[in-house]
């Protein structure tokens, strides 16, 4: 069963390179030359955001420093403020990037599943032993939710937007999709998924960790076994 693999994370080259095709490479007029620094800056910006998105999942918001991020991105500390007005602005983009990766991964798992089993596939992947172990490449909400109340408004806003997307994605997999109770079911499902993952990662008892995630899985989708 698939977990949350690194290959489904947002691809920096794809994002940063999306605008490179707007002007054919055969045009070398002044406009083309003037745009090169802007494009180079955009690519560098994406590298920083990707490094920060990995770091916040690995070390948390409090453990993510500007110097370490720039080093991880292969850049000097002094260039940071050419891309962000503050550390909080970087964290907001990182939270958005990490949250988007989790939603994209979930959507990919659902797309690969038979329609009638899409939620089961997602639950089994999300609550897998592999996902418990893979904090750096896993769900950003589970990795960071305990720190969220202490973050700047722009960071919380970015994270909240992606949480809402996950809730909506889950709601669309429910048999009652389109009815008022589907949204409530989705809220309970996502809260249980995330809470079980947080606890399974928190404890130092392997048996308890397995019991937590399996209990949540059986509660949310009893027919998966």
Description of each model-found segment:
Residues 78:
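Key DNA-contact positions within bacterial/archaeal DNA-binding proteins
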Residues 152-161, 173-225:
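Hydrophobic/aromatic-rich alpha-helical bundle segments in the mid-to-C-terminal region
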